[in-house]
C-alpha cells in the first residue's frame, strides 16, 4: 500500500491546544493513527459512553470484555464538553494515543476555541507498507519516484542527506540517492539504524511528511499483529475498569474534569461522540431489516467498506439499560479476513436504502378474482415464460447474486397485459396450421415438387400451452416455470427446493420442504440458514410469510402443513414493523 497526499494540515484536528506541538506534529500523528481515527474538537459538546472506555481498557490488556456491573449509579452516557486534547505517543512502541480532558454538563463554562478559518499550512505526505527488502539488514528503503519528487526535498545528484524528526522529537539522518539498474530513489545510510531502533518488520508502515518550509517528519504504524503488546501491570484489570467508572462518577458529582485515553490502533467502538454526530445517527431511526455500510481497515492497512443488515436492536449489557452504545445487532454480507463485531453503534455506520423504502406496488400484486375471459392473458404470461422471452418474466438467482441490488425486486411482478399476438398464436396452434411449399425446381438433384412440411417455430411452445389448456379444462392449477426448471425436467430431475428471501439480505436461500415434517422444523431450518439463533421461534422481531402461485402473501402457520407445501412458491422473512405496514396497506393477509 502506497499513498501520497497534498493536504491542508490536519483540518479535522483544528482546535487542539497543545503549545509544544506544531501543525507538522499533528499531521504526522494523524497519519500514524490511521484513517479511521476520530478526534473531537476543542470546546465541542460530546457524549461520553463509559462502556466504550471499559472496552478499550480490556482490548489494551487483551482481556475479554465481560459485563461489568456499575459499582455506582452512573448513566450509560454523559454529556460533556471537550476541555483539552493532547496528542501523544508511547515511548517504546511508537503507538499513538490521545488524552482528552472532559467536563460533564458545562453549559455555563466558557471554553476558548480555535477559529475554524485559521490558516493551516499545506503539507505533502506519503505512506508505504514495508517489504522484506526494506527491512533487511543489508538493504535500503526504495521510495517510489512520484513520492520522492513530491514529498522529499529536491535531489542534487548524486546524493543528499535528509534530516527527519519523529513524534518523540528524535532526529534521524538518511542518505538519499538516485541509483541502481533501473535507477530508483533510495534511502541507504542511516536507514538500517532507523529500522533496528524502531524494530520494524515486514508489514509495518512508514510515514513521511514534508512542510512548506522543507521540514521533514517521519513516523511509523505497527502491523496489526504487533499492536497491543502491553506489558503486564501490577494493577488488576478489574481495578482499571472500576477506575474508569469511579473517575467519571466523581467528575459528574463534583462538576470537575476527568481525562480519557483514546487509542486509535485498538479496534473498539467509538465512545466519545460529538453531539451533532449522535443526533444525526439517532434521526436515522435504525430498525430491524435496515441496510448499512461500515468502514474498516484490514490487516494490510487497506481501507474498504462492508455491507450488512440490522437483525436486532437491544442493549449490549443488561447492566447499562437504554444505552445506544453497540445497540445494533448486525449480520454481515460477506466474509472478511479479520474479525468484525456482531454489535455496532449507530454512529459508526452509514444508513442505506433498505427494502422498506422500495414501493410496495412494484414488489407485490394483490389477489383478485380471475375473470372467465382472462384465458388469453394467461397464455400471454406463459409466452413470456417461453425461451424466446426469458428476460421479460424470469430472472435466475445466479444473476441476482451477481447484482444484489436487483434481488430486492425479485418479487412476483404485475400481470402482463393482454397481447394480440398471443391470441393469434393460440389460434394458429388450435388450427394446427402447417406451411406447405410446392415448387417445380430441383435443388442439388433433389426434387422440390414434393410438398415440404415446415415445422412451426412455436410448435414446442404450443405443445406446452396445449397441455396447460387441457389442465385448465379439468380445473388444475398451473404455474409458470423458469427455463432452468424446464431444462432440469427434460433431464429427469425435479426441483423440490423453495426459495427463501429475508428482508434486507441480498442473497437468498433455499429450503427443501419435502424433508421437513411441519412448521417447527421449518422454523429451525430457517434459523440455521440465516443464523438467527432462536429469533424466529420467539416471533418478537421477525415474522414468516409466503407467496402462492398468484403472488398473494399470507403469514405462515394458518394452513395445514400439506396444504402449505402445495401452495407455497416463495418464503419471505419480514421484520415485525414491515408486517404491520403490509397489513395496513392490505398487501398481507392476516
UniProtKB/Swiss-Prot annotation:
Interactions between auxin response factors (ARFs) and Aux/IAA proteins occur through their C-terminal dimerization domains III and IV. GO terms for molecular function: DNA binding; DNA-binding transcription factor activity. Homodimers and heterodimers. This is Auxin response factor 20. Belongs to the ARF family. It comes from Arabidopsis thaliana (Mouse-ear cress). InterPro entries: ARF_dom, ARF_plant, AUX/IAA_dom, B3_DNA-bd, DNA-bd_pseudobarrel_sf, PB1-like. Residues 495-576 form the PB1 domain. Residues 126-224 bind DNA. Auxin response factors (ARFs) are transcriptional factors that bind specifically to the DNA sequence 5'-TGTCTC-3' found in the auxin-responsive promoter elements (AuxREs). Could act as transcriptional activator or repressor. Formation of heterodimers with Aux/IAA proteins may alter their ability to modulate early auxin response genes expression. The keyword Lipoprotein does not apply. It is found in: Nucleus. The keyword DNA-binding applies. GO terms for cellular component: nucleus. One of its GO terms (biological process) is auxin-activated signaling pathway. Keywords: Auxin signaling pathway, DNA-binding, Nucleus, Transcription, Transcription regulation. It comes from the Eukaryota.
Amino acid at each position: 500500500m502506497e499513498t501520497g497526499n497534498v493536504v491542508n494540515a490536519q483540518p479535522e484536528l483544528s482546535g487542539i491546544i497543545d503549545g509544544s506541538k506544531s501543525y507538522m506534529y499533528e499531521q504526522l500523528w494523524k497519519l500514524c493513527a490511521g484513517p479511521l481515527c476520530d478526534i473531537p474538537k476543542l470546546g465541542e459538546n460530546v457524549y461520553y459512553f463509559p462502556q466504550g472506555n471499559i472496552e478499550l481498557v480490556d482490548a489494551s490488556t487483551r482481556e475479554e470484555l465481560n459485563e461489568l456491573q456499575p459499582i455506582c449509579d452512573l448513566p450509560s452516557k454523559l454529556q460533556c464538553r471537550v476541555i483539552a486534547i493532547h496528542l501523544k505517543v508511547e515511548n517504546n512502541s511508537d503507538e499513538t494515543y490521545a488524552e482528552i480532558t472532559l467536563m460533564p454538563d458545562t453549559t455555563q463554562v466558557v471554553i476558548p476555541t480555535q477559529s475554524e478559518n485559521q490558516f493551516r499550512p499545506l503539507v505533502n505526505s506519503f505512506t508505504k507498507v514495508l517489504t522484506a527488502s526494506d527491512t533487511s539488514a543489508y538493504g535500503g528503503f526504495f521510495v517510489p519516484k512520484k513520492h520522492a519528487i513530491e514529498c522529499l526535498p529536491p535531489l542534487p545528484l548524486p546524493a543528499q542527506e535528509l534530516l527527519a524528526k519523529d513524534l518523540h522529537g528524535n532526529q534521524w539522518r538518511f542518505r538519499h540517492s538516485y541509483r541502481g539498474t533501473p535507477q530508483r530513489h533510495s534511502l541507504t545510510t542511516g536507514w538500517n539504524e532507523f529500522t533496528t531502533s524502531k524494530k520494524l518488520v515486514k508489514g509495518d508502515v512508514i510515514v513521511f511528511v514534508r512542510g512548506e518550509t522543507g521540514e521533514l517528519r517521519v513516523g511509523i504504524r505497527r502491523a496489526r499483529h504487533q499492536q497491543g503488546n502491553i506489558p503486564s501491570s501490577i494493577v488488576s484489570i478489574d481495578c482499571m475498569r472500576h477506575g474508569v467508572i469511579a473517575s467519571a462518577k466523581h467528575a459528574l458529582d463534583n462538576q470537575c474534569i476527568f481525562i480519557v485515553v483514546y487509542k486509535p490502533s485498538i479496534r473498539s467502538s467509538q465512545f466519545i461522540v460529538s453531539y451533532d454526530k449522535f443526533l444525526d445517527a439517532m434521526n436515522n431511526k435504525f430498525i430491524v431489516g435496515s441496510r448499512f455500510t461500515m468502514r474498516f481497515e484490514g490487516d494490510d492497512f487497506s481501507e474498504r467498506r462492508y455491507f450488512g443488515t440490522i437483525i436486532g436492536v437491544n442493549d449490549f449489557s443488561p447492566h447499562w439499560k437504554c444505552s445506544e452504545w453497540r445497540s445494533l445487532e448486525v449480520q454481515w454480507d460477506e466474509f472478511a479476513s479479520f474479525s468484525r463485531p456482531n454489535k455496532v453503534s449507530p454512529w459508526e455506520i452509514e444508513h442505506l436504502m433498505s427494502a422498506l423504502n422500495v414501493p410496495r406496488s412494484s414488489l407485490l400484486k394483490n389477489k383478485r378474482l380471475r375473470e372467465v375471459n382472462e384465458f388469453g392473458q394467461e397464455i400471454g404470461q406463459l409466452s413470456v415464460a417461453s425461451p424466446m422471452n426469458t428476460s421479460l418474466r424470469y430472472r435466475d438467482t445466479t444473476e441476482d447474486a451477481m447484482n444484489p441490488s436487483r434481488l430486492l425486486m425479485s418479487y412476483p411482478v404485475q400481470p402482463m397485459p393482454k397481447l394480440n399476438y398471443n391470441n393469434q398464436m393460440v389460434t394458429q396452434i388450435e388450427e394446427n396450421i402447417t406451411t406447405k411449399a410446392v415448387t417445380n425446381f430441383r435443388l442439388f438433384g433433389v426434387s422440390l415438387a414434393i410438398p415440404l412440411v415446415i415445422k412451426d417455430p412455436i410448435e414446442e411452445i404450443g405443445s406446452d400451452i396445449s397441455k396447460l389448456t387441457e389442465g385448465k379444462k379439468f380445473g388444475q392449477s398451473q404455474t409458470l416455470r423458469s427455463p432452468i426448471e424446464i431444462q432440469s425436467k427434460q433431464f429427469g430431475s425435479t426441483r423440490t427446493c423453495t426459495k427463501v428471501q429475508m428482508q434486507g439480505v441480498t442473497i437468498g436461500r433455499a429450503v427443501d420442504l419435502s424433508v421437513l415434517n411441519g412448521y417447527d422444523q421449518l422454523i429451525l431450518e430457517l434459523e440455521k440458514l440465516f443464523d438467527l439463533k432462536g429469533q424466529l421461534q420467539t416471533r418478537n422481531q421477525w415474522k414468516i410469510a409466503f407467496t402462492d402461485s398468484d403472488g398473494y402473501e399470507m403469514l405462515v402457520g394458518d394452513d395445514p402443513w400439506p396444504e402449505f407445501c402445495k401452495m407455497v412458491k416463495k418464503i419471505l422473512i419480514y421484520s415485525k414493523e414491515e408486517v404491520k405496514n403490509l397489513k395496513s396497506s392490505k398487501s398481507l393477509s392476516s
